[in-house]
């Protein structure tokens, strides 16, 4: 007598993007979490999908009849992700956890889930769904046990829109997309080399064009202020060679969009690349300057990148071409003094850097820095909600942690003084965008600074306007 064949069933899935209590407030968040967008696009059509994104104040239905609840998590969202997972499991639901944080904290995450996924899901998700359908879900699925991911999954924007119930937006809200994945560099503070990997992958031109046109149709609504949609390119590094970069920019030029992108300083030293960026619709590049000190850049494995003088020159060339440069800077108590912070504030103001971002160096799980600091016993706090880059979670030989954080926050806030905002708007292109984003940052930073001073009984006669 033969055993009956077990039939796979159609599943009802809920994908959740949690928001940590100390996650930053921003008006620049993309319309959906890219990890969830990829999962939706990988999931066969016979399965029903719902999305709940707490960054958009979506409510979570804990009483839904879901066959599987999938939760993705960054480090800052991990505590909230575990809270949600525990609540669903109390109600007897199957929970799967994945994402950056879970991939490098598997043992911790296992206590809150029926199953965890480590690494990229592209080549393992079909197996997970099949096992759920057959009632034999395994405790762990690790990307290392599956064939390497060599392609980018085209996003199914129609299905994402249907599952998320997100309304159409104008050109002031960003639609996320991948053009490439992977990065060949090994910056010590970055998780990309150990998660996405160093293998550089590009979208097929026809796939990219089709996705952009579909995204326009389901997510964009033109108005008097914006005739083109704004896409946020979520690539870790858009170009690894000038030839491939220019091919990508020529392709984007024909798509009639505006976009912003993370970009390597190396390519911005070429004026023709700047011109092609602008002509292809790029209105903003986010550049990881990290520091204006050469010794600090070398400590981060970025010593090959340049100097403050070249930074200033490139920023001005971009500005003259019509391109905003958003600068990201890291502050490290082992490498940077209070005077260095003052110098950084001066540099940002002098160069009118668009929407500057300051971050205290944070050893995120999965980075080379995390393993080094943990091995040396230098991590002082494992409260993941504090891993938002404005809290000091590492040991400092030179500074009191509270004094260092306060200096950092006041320095950061100074870059959004009224005079700096006015000069930024005056000197940069896209003046309305500069004003709106600067005001939002100023409001958020003021709230964070006031809360910090209140919590630590810091009295100040601050005169920052």
Residue ranges and their predicted role:
Residues 2-15, 45-51, 67, 132, ...:
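Radical SAM enzyme core and accessory elements
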Residues 2-217, 226:
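Acidic, low-complexity intrinsically disordered segments
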Residues 22-23, 105-108, 295-301, 331-339, ...:
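Flexible glycine/acidic-rich beta-alpha junction loops that bind and position SAM and/or redox cofactors
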Residues 42, 46, 87, 91, ...:
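Alpha-helical structural signal in soluble globular domains
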Residues 66-75, 246-252, 256, 337-353, ...:
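Short, electropositive alpha-helical surface patch
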Residues 73, 77, 101, 121, ...:
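Structured beta->alpha junctions
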Residues 108-127, 276-286, 343-358:
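Structural recognition of alpha->loop->beta junctions
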Residues 157-326, 333, 339, 346:
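Radical SAM [4Fe-4S] cluster-binding motif and immediate context
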């Amino acid at each position: 007598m033969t055993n009956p064949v077990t039939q796979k069933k159609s599943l009802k899935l809920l994908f959740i993007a949690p928001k940590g209590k100390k996650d930053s407030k921003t008006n620049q968040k993309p319309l959906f979490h890219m990890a969830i967008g990829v999962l939706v696009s990988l999931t066969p059509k016979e399965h029903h999908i719902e999305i709940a994104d707490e960054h958009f104040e979506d409510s979570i239905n804990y009483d839904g009849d879901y066959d599987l609840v999938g939760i993705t998590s960054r480090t800052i969202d991990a505590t909230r992700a575990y809270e949600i997972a525990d609540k669903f499991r109390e109600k007897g639901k199957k929970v799967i956890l994945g994402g950056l944080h879970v991939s490098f904290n598997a043992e911790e995450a296992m206590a809150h889930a029926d199953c965890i996924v480590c690494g990229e899901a592209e080549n393992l998700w079909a197996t997970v769904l099949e096992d759920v359908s057959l009632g034999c879900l395994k405790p762990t699925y690790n990307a290392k046990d599956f064939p390497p991911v060599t392609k980018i999954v085209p996003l199914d924007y129609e299905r994402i829109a249907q599952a998320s119930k997100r309304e159409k937006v104008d050109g002031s809200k960003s639609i996320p997309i991948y053009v490439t994945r992977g990065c060949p560099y090994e910056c010590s503070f970055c998780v990309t080399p150990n998660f996405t990997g160093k293998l550089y992958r590009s979208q097929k031109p026809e796939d990219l064009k089709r996705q952009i046109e579909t995204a326009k149709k389901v997510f964009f609504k033109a108005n008097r202020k914006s005739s083109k949609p704004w896409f946020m390119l979520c690539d870790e590094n858009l170009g690894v060679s000038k030839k491939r970069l220019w091919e990508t920019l020529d392709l984007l030029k024909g798509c009639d969009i505006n976009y912003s992108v993370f970009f390597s300083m190396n390519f911005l030293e070429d004026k023709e690349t700047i011109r092609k960026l602008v002509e292809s619709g790029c209105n903003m590049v986010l550049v990881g300057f990290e520091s204006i000190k050469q010794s600090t850049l070398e400590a981060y494995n970025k010593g090959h990148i340049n100097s403050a003088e070249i930074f200033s020159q490139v920023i001005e060339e971009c500005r003259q071409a019509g391109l905003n440069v958003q600068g990201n800077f890291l502050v490290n108590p082992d490498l940077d003094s209070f005077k260095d912070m003052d110098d950084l504030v001066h540099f940002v103001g002098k160069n009118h850097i668009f929407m500057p971002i300051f971050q205290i160096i944070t050893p995120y799980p999965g980075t080379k820095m995390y393993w080094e600091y943990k091995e040396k016993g230098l991590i002082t706090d494992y409260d993941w909600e504090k891993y938002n880059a404005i809290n000091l979670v590492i040991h400092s030989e030179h500074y009191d942690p509270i004094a260092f954080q306060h200096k950092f926050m006041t320095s950061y806030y100074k870059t959004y003084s009224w005079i700096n905002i006015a000069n930024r708007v005056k000197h940069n292109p896209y003046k309305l965008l500069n004003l709106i984003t600067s005001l939002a940052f100023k409001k958020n930073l003021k709230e964070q600074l006031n809360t910090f001073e209140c919590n630590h009984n810091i009295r100040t006669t601050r005169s920052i306007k």
